[in-house]
Swiss-Prot record:
NADP(+) binds at residues 22-46. This is Tropinone reductase homolog At2g29360. The active site is at Y168 (proton acceptor). GO terms for molecular function: oxidoreductase activity. The lineage of its organism: Eukaryota, Viridiplantae, Streptophyta, Embryophyta, Tracheophyta. Optimum pH is 7.5 for quinuclidinone reduction. Optimum pH is 6.0 for 4-methylcyclohexanone reduction. The keyword Oxidoreductase applies. Belongs to the short-chain dehydrogenases/reductases (SDR) family. SDR65C subfamily. It is an enzyme of class 1 (oxidoreductase).
């Protein structure tokens, strides 16, 4: 049975000073916001992305803010590159890692009957296999830290139906179950695992879709809060789940969706 050691009780509950983190896909969107949120709380961070130019632009910005961030180019859909990434992280952080944020994801929007075998394998490799394998690779580092936290950036598509996203939804639903499994299996190693499921968030991934005024109105009509989310509304939850303040929270799937997943039949009462 895992115990809350003196070292955990003695840590500041609302600080990540002295902790280390790996955030995949950290050069834009939710990943970039997560890097900044964790760094603001004092964590040392390594992040990766496929686009070296964009990664270097982000790094210059973080260095100007005084954040402790290192970077490397990595396509996490490749098994060999994931292994090399974790070797790099282990070297930088001297064999210990407190936080793993599996953020990288892709979505191919098509009706189910139009999806190809290539669509399926690419989506699964990028979204699910990468999260599964990186969690495996990170386990000894997380265990060595004495207090580990894994956050899986999932989606409401893994909780409810979203049209045109059948493969994506399958990958995210499996990711949510992975979070529950790891939470139970690795609790004795003082490693917590939680999934965060956003609805539409203002990111480069959805900019083109949301530029269609009719589509945006439809999206905004679904959550009771009547709008899409901002990246910092996701990154703040991710950061909280990594804090000592969240030390008894594990195995949870938490939606950041303005109430989308709990919204039933809404109507205005008759006059």
């Amino acid at each position: 049975m895992a115990k809350t050691g003196e070292s955990l009780r003695d840590k500041p509950r609302w600080s990540l000073v002295g902790m280390t983190a790996l955030v995949t896909g950290g050069s834009k969107g939710i990943g970039e916001a997560v890097v900044e949120e964790l760094a603001t709380l004092g964590a040392r961070i390594h992040t990766c992305a496929r686009d070296e130019t964009q990664l270097q632009e982000s790094l210059r910005k973080w260095q100007a803010k005084g954040f402790q961030v290192t970077t490397s180019v990595c396509d996490v859909s490749s098994r060999d590159k994931r292994e090399k990434l974790m070797e790099t992280v282990s070297t930088i952080f001297e064999g210990k890692l407190n936080i793993l944020v599996n953020n990288v994801g892709t979505c191919i929007v098509k009706p189910t009957l139009q999806h190809t075998a290539e669509d399926f394998s690419f989506t699964m490799a990028t979204n699910l296999e990468s999260a599964f394998h990186l969690s495996q690779l990170a386990h000894p580092l997380l265990k060595a830290s004495g207090s580990g936290s894994i956050v899986l950036i999932s989606s409401v598509s893994g909780v409810v139906h979203v049209n045109g996203a059948s493969i994506y939804g399958v990958s995210k639903g499996a990711m949510n179950q992975l979070g529950r499994n790891l939470a139970c299996e690795w609790a004795s190693d003082n490693i917590r695992t939680n999934s965060v499921c956003p609805w539409f968030i203002e990111t480069p991934l959805v900019t083109e879709s949301l530029s269609n005024e009719e589509f945006r109105k439809e999206v905004e009509s679904r959550p009771p809060m009547g709008r899409v989310g901002e990246v910092n509304e996701v990154s703040s939850l991710v950061a909280f789940l990594c804090l000592p303040a969240a030390s008894y929270i594990t195995g949870q799937t938490i939606c950041v969706d303005g109430g989308f997943t709990v919204n039933g039949f809404s109507f205005k009462p008759l006059p």
